[in-house]
Amino acid sequence: MPTVVNYKDYIGAIQDFPIKGITYRDIQPLLANETVFRNSIKDMGNLIDKKPEYWIALESRGFLFASALSMIYGGGIRLIRKKGKLGNSQLVRVDYGLEYGKDSFEMANFPEKKGTKVVIVDDIYATGGTMQAAETLCKKVGYEVTDQLCLIDIGIVEQHEVKCLINY
């Protein structure tokens, strides 16, 4: 059962950051409140039907949410990092667009069984470029993405499959 919390009360808004025209959603107030953070994790987990074998954590704030989801719901964690931050020799890479630029993601290509069920986790859903890149990496490795999960949808893309706890 979802908790009754107005999570937007715990999200700050910083205008024109990181560039003019962008409103940065600051999750620090939510993270600073232990009860609200815990409830947000439980409510995020309740958005998906089946718990995965792995939570795929996107750099960097996705690490916070995927770790907490793993602790509450079980399952391991796999990291997707920005280019050049993983030391593994077996890496898969993809380039993608952001709402204000371009970047690259990398993921270790662990020898796992094909079709391992995963849920991709991040803090913010904006244009969908990050989630699409993460899904591409997961498929290259052989994972089956069962869900994509974010704390916040900032409302740029009207229709998408990503499950978000807070919608603007």
Where are these regions (language model features)?
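Conserved acidic residues
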Residues: 53, 116, 146
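Generic enzyme active-site microenvironment
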Residues: 57, 120-121
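Short Gly/Thr/Asp-enriched flexible loops that form oxyanion-binding sites at enzyme active sites
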Residues: 64-73, 135
